[in-house]
């Protein structure tokens, strides 16, 4: 048994905070998390760590992950050699874990990298978050997954699987299942920035029949389905087909909101606004002018997203943290910016943003409820922070403030600065926290 004593505790519920607390865990699971007064008696041989006032919270869940994206531009995602992608993906996984994200739901992978990354993490060869592995995006001809014009004949297919018709869709899902994928990603509508004649938001890439076949085949094979859906039409098609994770949902009409509310016990929505926000900061570097359709379009999209998230929160729909990190303007390692966006743009309190990243993310990752909060019986995933995110959510963006990360009872430090060894025992963590006390 390991006991973290003398800590400030946030257990994953938005309204919970305990300033004089302890957490006890063994065999990768929580035994107790709460006030020091009333904590269980220690077993012989229990290892006690003095937390020196550090803030302890559940490990976070990145719910829109692209670990195999290598900080390229949005139209360059499949241009790197697969060998280079693998090397960078291993680095990205370590950075994500070191940033306090102990779990990740993939929203798409280049090539088959995610599935092999998951195997490497599970067998201990790679340091990274537990992963629901994604595969190549499934899209129709002319969709946001169909990046290359016919005349180019580039023979590059590392990002998308282009399918038309129910049987092509079904075969693509079966191929992903064969490759070890957990989450099938489908492009339901388009993007304001698309190569060539790619479809835009609001234009559906698949018929109702095609999408129903995709979801049905995925669920039949034990996989879940994530989608890119910006428009109300795309959200409605996704919910009706049974999609599990909806990415973006920027524009909602009354019917789309009603469908989401009716299915709020099974469906999760992640607005993933990092792209829009950073594009509006850097659009000129992409060659766009102020007032261009793309600039005005993303500004309107961000404003619409704020209204949509407000309505979803009022309807009790779980809104998740995760934001298309892995692009050149949203690089790996900046994942915690998303919590800041939740407070700045969506009106979340810091506690509500933390709950979205922990409790609700855990419910999305593991529907059985075993992940995302620090309560007896739950998986022992924790982040030890020098500072109080409930007072200043931005502290989670400071690499120096992440004192340690605990994933399923294993303690890690130094993942962001290449210190070695990364894994620590209780005595080493006790020494580390004592060297940088918070009280």
Predicted regions, residues:
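His/Asp/Glu-enriched, well-ordered alpha-helical/loop segment
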Residues: 220, 290-293, 302-388
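Active-site core of metal-dependent hydrolases
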Residues: 188-303, 320, 325-327, 346-348, ...
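Active-site mouth loops of central-metabolism enzymes
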Residues: 74-87, 148-171, 203, 224-226
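Active-site microenvironment of metallo-dependent hydrolases
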Residues: 1-21, 26-27, 36, 90-97, ...
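Divalent metal-dependent hydrolysis catalytic cores, especially in the metallo-beta-lactamase
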Residues: 88-114, 127-137, 181-194, 224, ...
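Metal-associated gating/positioning segment near the N- to mid-region
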Residues: 54-125, 141-145, 209, 241
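Active-site metal-binding motif and surrounding structural segment of the metallo-beta-lactamase
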Residues: 37-57, 80-83, 177
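Histidine-centered divalent metal-coordination motifs
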Residues: 52-54, 64-68, 219, 228, ...
């Amino acid at each position: 048994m390991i006991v973290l004593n003398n800590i400030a505790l946030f257990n994953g519920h938005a309204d919970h905070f305990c300033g004089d607390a302890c957490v006890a865990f063994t065999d990768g699971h929580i035994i107790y998390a709460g006030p020091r007064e009333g904590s269980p008696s220690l077993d012989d041989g229990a290892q006690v760590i003095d937390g020196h006032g550090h803030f302890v919270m559940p490990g976070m869940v990145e719910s829109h992950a692209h670990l195999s994206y290598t900080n390229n531009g949005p139209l360059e995602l499949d241009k790197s050699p697969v060998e280079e992608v693998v090397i960078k993906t291993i680095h990205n996984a370590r950075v994500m874990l070191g940033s306090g994200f102990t779990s990740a739901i993939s929203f798409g992978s280049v090539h088959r990298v995610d599935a092999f990354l998951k195997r490497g993490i599970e067998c201990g060869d790679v340091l990274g978050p537990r992963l629901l592995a994604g595969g190549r995006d499934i899209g129709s001809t002319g969709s946001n997954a169909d990046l290359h014009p016919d005349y180019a004949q580039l023979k590059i297919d590392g990002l998308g699987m282009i399918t038309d018709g129910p049987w092509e869709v079904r075969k693509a899902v079966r191929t992903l299942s064969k490759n070890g994928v957990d989450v099938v990603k489908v492009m339901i509508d388009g993007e304001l920035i698309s190569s060539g004649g790619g479809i835009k938001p609001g234009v559906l890439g698949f018929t109702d029949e095609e999408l129903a076949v995709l979801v049905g085949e995925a669920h039949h094979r034990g996989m879940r389905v994530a989608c890119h859906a910006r428009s109300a039409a795309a959200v409605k098609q996704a919910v009706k087909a049974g999609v599990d994770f909806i990415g973006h949902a920027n524009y909602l009409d009354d019917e789309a909101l009603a469908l989401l509310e009716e299915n709020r016990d099974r469906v999760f929505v992640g607005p993933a606004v990092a792209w829009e926000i950073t594009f509006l900061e850097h659009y000129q570097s992409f060659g766009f002018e102020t007032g261009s359709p793309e600039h005005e379009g993303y500004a309107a999209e961000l404003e619409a997203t704020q209204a949509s998230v407000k309505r979803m929160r009022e309807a009790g729909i779980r809104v998740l943290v995760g934001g298309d990190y892995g692009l050149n303007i949203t690089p790996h390692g900046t994942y915690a910016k998303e919590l800041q966006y939740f407070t700045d743009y969506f009106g979340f309190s810091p506690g509500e943003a933390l709950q979205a990243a922990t409790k609700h993310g855990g419910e999305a990752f593991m529907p059985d409820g075993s992940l995302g909060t620090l309560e007896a019986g739950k998986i022992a995933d924790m982040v030890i922070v020098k500072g109080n995110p409930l007072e200043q959510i931005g502290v989670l963006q400071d690499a120096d403030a992440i004192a340690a990360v605990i994933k399923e009872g294993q303690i890690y430090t130094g993942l962001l600065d290449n210190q070695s060894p990364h894994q620590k025992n209780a005595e080493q963590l006790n020494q580390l926290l004592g060297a940088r006390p918070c009280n």
